[in-house]
Swiss-Prot record:
The keyword Cell wall biogenesis/degradation applies. This is Phospho-N-acetylmuramoyl-pentapeptide-transferase. GO terms for molecular function: metal ion binding; phospho-N-acetylmuramoyl-pentapeptide-transferase activity; UDP-N-acetylmuramoyl-L-alanyl-D-glutamyl-meso-2,6-diaminopimelyl-D-alanyl-D-alanine:undecaprenyl-phosphate transferase activity. Belongs to the glycosyltransferase 4 family. MraY subfamily. The lineage of its organism: Bacteria, Pseudomonadati, Pseudomonadota, Gammaproteobacteria, Alteromonadales. GO terms for cellular component: plasma membrane. It catalyses: UDP-N-acetyl-alpha-D-muramoyl-L-alanyl-gamma-D-glutamyl-meso-2,6-diaminopimeloyl-D-alanyl-D-alanine + di-trans,octa-cis-undecaprenyl phosphate = di-trans,octa-cis-undecaprenyl diphospho-N-acetyl-alpha-D-muramoyl-L-alanyl-D-glutamyl-meso-2,6-diaminopimeloyl-D-alanyl-D-alanine + UMP. It is an enzyme of class 2 (transferase). The keyword RNA-binding does not apply. It comes from Alteromonas mediterranea (strain DSM 17117 / CIP 110805 / LMG 28347 / Deep ecotype). It is a multi-pass membrane protein. It is found in: Cell inner membrane. Keywords: Cell cycle, Cell division, Cell inner membrane, Cell membrane, Cell shape, Cell wall biogenesis/degradation, Magnesium, Membrane, Metal-binding, Peptidoglycan synthesis, Transferase, Transmembrane, Transmembrane helix. Its EC number is 2.7.8.13. Its cofactor is Mg(2+).
Length: 360
């Protein structure tokens, strides 16, 4: 939005042309989202406490979690507000990729909000019934998938980039819709499963979003794309602004969510952040790299699938508790140790994902 104002003001002072530079707007986007989260955070936490919008803790989980009962939740609203406001201010809103991404942020945020509202405010322990949650996630994901497929103007927009292999860009055709669907819905639910310890989900989200900012920049830059031998998609450049807004908002939220957490993001945050990472992966054509960089999310999800499958088939559990972060807690690891070690794993995996730009 401000890019339009700066463009108009350029006729009076050429100095305003500086706001057309993507790198400057990326920095300002990060700082704007960070400041929004830092400044509004305390007020939101006090409001949530006053309204008694607190987390309910299961009594069959780690005993250390019982002290978390009543901690304000639905703090994801703070993250989403910071992302959307910063994105609207600093991104080019004529870019359809930006609009699609912000739509996913809001749509999945609404789904998560309804789930949290039913669980926390209406005291319905089941929240939004699973089949309805999945239904609405699917509606949004399929709507985005069909739109992106039908509006594609370049073959690169619907090709699959295979990491570590040079010049392997198979055309997906109609399978693009299927991959897009699973990328968005799958990542949304994976981040939701990961969000079980203080700061556990937000730091990998920040790291992956930061990496996608790099992918978006090089994919949208013709010179870098040619040098790295990746498809050039000009529209991805503006996604840098959304990615950096996610980084800033995430850092601001981490200020209050770090151990011991003053607020939890709730489903309104985790579902929206996961869905956004999924659509970003699709837009920058890095769905397979998302599996690498989001390895912590994948690990958490697989632990649940294996646990449920093993119990139904054999009547035995593989882990003491799933998702797997609870398994390590029940083994005696202090919560901060579990969190930081998962962060370290995430840092390593993101670096491996970034290395795919050159190692091919």
């Amino acid at each position: 939005m401000l890019i339009w104002l700066a463009d108009w003001l350029t006729q009076f002072d050429s100095g305003f042309n500086v706001f057309s530079y993507l790198t400057l707007r990326a920095i300002l986007s990060t700082l704007t989202a960070l400041l929004i989260a830092i400044l509004i955070g305390p007020k939101m936490i006090r409001y949530l406490q006053r309204m008694q919008i607190g987390q309910t803790v299961r009594d069959d989980g780690p005993q250390s979690h019982l002290s978390k009962s009543g901690t304000p939740t639905m703090g994801g609203l703070l993250i989403l507000a910071a992302i959307v406001v910063s994105g609207l201010l600093w991104a080019d809103l004529t870019n359809r990729y930006v609009l699609v991404t912000l739509t996913v942020v809001v749509a999945y945020g609404i789904i998560g909000f309804v789930d949290d509202y039913r669980k926390v405010i209406r005291k319905d322990s089941k929240g939004l019934i699973a089949r309805w949650k999945y239904f609405w996630q699917s509606v949004v994901a399929l709507g985005v998938a069909f739109y992106l497929y039908s509006s594609a103007t370049m073959s690169a927009e619907t090709s699959l980039l295979v990491p570590f292999f040079k010049e392997v860009f198979p055309q997906l055709g109609i399978f693009f819709i299927i991959i897009t669907y699973f990328a968005i819905v799958g990542t949304s639910n994976a981040v939701n499963l990961t969000d079980g310890l203080d700061g556990l989900a937000i730091v990998p989200t920040i790291l992956v979003a930061g990496a996608f900012a790099i992918f978006a920049y090089v994919t949208g830059n013709a010179n870098f794309a040619e040098y790295l031998n990746i498809p050039h998609i000009p529209l991805t450049s503006e996604l840098v602004i959304v990615c950096t807004a996610m980084v800033g908002a995430g850092l601001g939220f981490l200020w209050f969510n770090t151990y011991p957490a003053q607020v939890f993001m709730g489903d309104v945050g985790s579902l929206a952040l996961g869905g956004t990472l999924g659509v970003l992966a699709v837009l920058v054509r890095q769905e397979l790299v998302l599996i690498i960089m989001g390895g912590v999310f994948v690990m958490e999800t697989l632990s649940v699938i294996l646990q449920v499958g093993s119990y139904k088939l054999r009547g035995q559990r593989i882990f003491r508790m799933a998702p797997i972060h609870h398994h390590y807690e029940l083994k005696g690891w202090p919560e901060p140790r579990v969190i930081v070690r998962f962060w370290i794993i995430s840092i390593i995996l993101v670096l491996v994902g970034l290395a795919t730009l050159k190692l091919r």
